[in-house]
Amino acid sequence: MLPLRRSLLKPLQDVLRHSHRQMSQKNLLELTDRGFFHGIFPDTAAPRMKQLFTRGQQSIYAGFDPTADSLHVGNLLVIMGLIHCQRAGHRPIALVGGATGLIGDPSGRKTERNQLGETVIETNLKAIEQQLRRVFENHENCLWDSKKQKLPLAPLIIVNNADWYADLQLIDFVANMGRHFRMGSMLSRSSVQSRLESEDGMSFTEFTYQIFQAYDWLHLLRRHNCCFQMGGSDQTGNLMTGHELISRVERKREVFGLTLPLVTTEEGDKFGKSAGNAVWLDGNKTSPFALYQFFLRMPDSEVEKLLKLFTFIPLPQVEQLMREHTKEPEKRKAQTLLAEDVTLLVHGESGLKQAERVTNALYKGNVEGLAELNLSEIQQTFQGATMVNLLTEPGMSILELAMKAKCFPTETDAVRIINAGGFYVNQKRVQNIAEVLTTGVHILRNGISLLRVGKRNFYIVRWQ
């Protein structure tokens, strides 16, 4: 598929889009230049890793526990890592933790996770698998040109660790595998130490998590010849435990860990659902418009780093884009391309078009653009807005509309706030309480009116 054409960034964008299609080198460690890797394990293994990456196809896996029914932006960086592996000619494996999700990873957490039931886990698993497949498909369809590449993309492999734990017997597992783990090493992990020093301590359930993640790697090594594991920097301890297990059980095999930086806000807060500020990859939880706006609003101090992490634009073109951006920062060229590429990857061409359509309607005073949105798009955009069904009545005034939609507790409040300029219909301020509603201005041709009181209180009126 040819890339979408967007006039805002022409002619620079033509160069950038064409550059997206160039095949990466097979040595994944070159991504270090993008700030993509936080570290490698063992830390002296770079020469050997380079040799393996350039010698032939390798298998690299990353894990995703089904602790929610959607992945979030923090997970997206790990997905980007797997796609980079795919682009470099290697084989990506996504492990979904149908078993480990029941235990809960203590890494990076101050308290124990709430236990999830098997039914919830199963529902979350299906949703996450669909998201992973959709993101990989969007990349192949929208950001990759197979005709210009020497090698085809290796298909994504998704495995569920519940499949190999289902038939394991507890006593056999402890007897055969438990002897290869050393308590001193396990207790020394930072994720364990921080919890042991806390008031609530750490449960045995959470303590065993690193054992199961280590065994996952051993299983994938044996089944898929998977010598590489990738994860956030908070996974370093778990990667080390897996490396130690394999070095004892499969002494002739070499395995390596790749850790990625944790994505944080400008204030240093983690982008994760536990932090309460999650940006989800599910369009029903975070709409394509909201995802687009999230990246569009990134400060200048962050945008270059995020372009390197969340897009496939080669570094010379990132530098060129930043030079253009520095000359005219008010045009937000860098943020716009970042928002476009991430939205395209997560939601595909239709999601990006929707995000751009809503952006034009809301922020460029385009009433016609607002009229092109359907009810679902408006509801996704204004999540939490009050929904009201009203009958059209000839001669209805602005004041009557506001009261029927229950925008104000009293008519006195309505008159005061409307006269003061605090009431909007379809993103246009209205101050005449006697103004009569007209089709095309107040009532859009899609049969909807968007009301707003102040900056954030939205009401969606669906006319009958």
Curated annotation (Swiss-Prot):
One Pfam entry for this protein is tRNA-synt_1b
Locate the residues binding ATP: D65, K273
BP terms from Gene Ontology: mitochondrial tyrosyl-tRNA aminoacylation; tRNA aminoacylation; tyrosyl-tRNA aminoacylation
Q: Which reaction does this chain catalyze?
A: tRNA(Tyr) + L-tyrosine + ATP = L-tyrosyl-tRNA(Tyr) + AMP + diphosphate + H(+)
Enzyme class, broadest EC rank: ligase
What positions does the entry give for L-tyrosine binding?
A: Y61, D105, Y209, Q213, D216, Q235
What are this entry's molecular-function GO terms?
ATP binding; RNA binding; tyrosine-tRNA ligase activity
List the InterPro entries hit by this protein, alphabetically.
aa-tRNA-synth_I_CS, aa-tRNA-synth_Ic, Rossmann-like_a/b/a_fold, S4_RNA-bd_sf, Tyr-tRNA-ligase, Tyr-tRNA-ligase_bac-type, Tyr-tRNA-ligase_bac_1
Name the domain of life: Eukaryota
Could you give the subunit structure recorded for this chain? Answer: Homodimer.
Family matches, as PANTHER family: TYROSINE--TRNA LIGASE, MITOCHONDRIAL, TYROSYL-TRNA SYNTHETASE
Protein name stated in the entry: Tyrosine--tRNA ligase, mitochondrial
Tell me which species this is from: Drosophila melanogaster
